[in-house]
């Protein structure tokens, strides 16, 4: 296990959370606005402390009395919803270097580590001197991920990573997340309400409703739980509603990972529909 919640509550915002984020796997943390998703992630970093229960983060216990979060914050990388809010220097190189220097990374290995972080996310070295504020939305997201990966954390948390991205950038993000998981063996937690995105990558799904665990499934079971998503206040794409209502399509044998674009083509090409 990477992170385990043991009967965790926080004031009246989160109630009796019991859940394990599995090591080396993708987990989607979903729920309507105000359900407690981001607050749950803040507990993993020690930004807020549980008022009841405890959680284990990579073997380190966080409870209401915990004071030292040095190891945890180095091993859990966090990419915020709006990457530009993280940037405050005038070059891509300086952005990545800042976190490394702050964590006392060896200066003689700094350039190599910065280059390695850019390579991991597919950004060219020619971007090193570029102002981060001039990057496209997809490039800013990649840079924010590179900053998080530069310290080689075991866990990466992405907060609403698709919210400002176009379709091309979302496709590139999907491929990057696959690479991070498979090649670098990271545990990835994705906070999102983008159901289309959830369907593109196989993973675990934790649905919160009013601060409580409402659903704990794997992504191949998502179509069987559409009504529960809607009752929790989630917005479900029209194509998913269509699939859910059509017995012919619902009973069709799709792969565990359902790519919406591929599905649309299958629907169009099915002469019996």
Description of each model-found segment:
Residues 45:
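Helix-to-loop junction immediately C-terminal to a conserved catalytic motif
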Residues 109-126:
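Conserved ABC ATPase "signature" region
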Residues 145:
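Hydrophobic anchor residue at the start of the ABC signature
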Residues 156-159:
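Catalytic Walker B motif of ABC-type/P-loop ATPase nucleotide-binding domains
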Residues 131-135, 139:
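Conserved ABC ATPase signature
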Residues 53-64, 71-72:
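Conserved ABC transporter NBD signature motif
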Residues 152:
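Conserved catalytic motifs of ABC-family nucleotide-binding domains
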